[in-house]
Design a protein with these regions (language model features):
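Small-residue-biased structural context
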Residues: 1-152
């Protein structure tokens, strides 16, 4: 299904797209929703870290729907056209121009979205001292930070 190595730089465009569609997006969606629910639940037992958990929840309430929307646009707009380009190249054919001018337009938008999410998770990393729980933290808070670090 996928190459044995995880050196993505050696993968073909088609292999990368398939990996994202079959693995990265489904797992990202599932983990994102689980993490957001976990953060909401952790609010109940956060104790001294409640103010931090509130900010984590606030950011995840924005991030997870944004990620879902981003994934949807990649799946509906970007990837189908890239697959069409790959097929045309393999068959040495030409295809019609992208419907909104150039494929670079949605790519730039999506790259900006990636940068915004990186900033958001950078903020959470700083807020949580690199996802490190203080000694007195609850087990739920420790688990939330560990899962958030894995998600990022």
């Amino acid at each position: 299904m996928f190459p044995d190595n995880k050196n993505f730089e050696t993968w073909s465009t088609r292999e990368l797209i398939n990996y994202v569609l079959e693995y990265h997006h489904p797992i990202g969606r599932r983990r994102g929703h689980v993490l957001r629910n976990q953060a909401r639940t952790t609010l109940e037992t956060a104790g001294a870290q409640r103010h931090i958990v509130e900010k984590i929840v606030e950011q995840l309430e924005i991030s997870i729907p944004d990620l879902d929307s981003h994934f949807d646009r990649e799946e509906a707009v970007l990837f189908p056209y890239l697959i069409e380009l790959c097929t045309a190249e393999e068959n040495k054919q030409r295809i019609e121009a992208f419907h909104c001018g150039t494929i670079l337009n949605p790519i730039h938008v999506m790259m900006n979205e990636h940068a915004m999410e990186q900033d958001r998770y950078g903020y959470l990393e700083t807020l949580t001292d690199n996802f490190t729980a203080p000694a007195e933290a609850t087990e739920e808070y420790r688990n939330l930070l560990a899962d958030l670090k894995t998600f990022v």
